[in-house]
């Protein structure tokens, strides 16, 4: 598959695709006799993985290390290191998801109670009487 087809399939820019290869986030891609990149299924899997992990916030550095390890001769130690990288990234993603869920829950709470809160403020002369202790609400 040629670069333009990969770009369309994966919904990424040519610059991003070239950058991934340049920095080592994906393994080197084979080229045809004219020097054009030819992507195989393995390359597409790497691009798909990298795109999704980047969207999830995984660092370029972690992806470079993961790819570097993948290109070494296979042994249990290398595979354990790769799995460790993935586990660490999953932990970080779960922490970020918790923060996002907490923020979403707070926003939903504020939206659900907004009219009532505004009514209390409008009915009172002192705004401080109506300060809600959001950090205690759980």
Residue map of PLM features:
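Arg/Lys-rich, alpha-helical DNA-contact motif
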Residues: 2-5, 27, 41-138
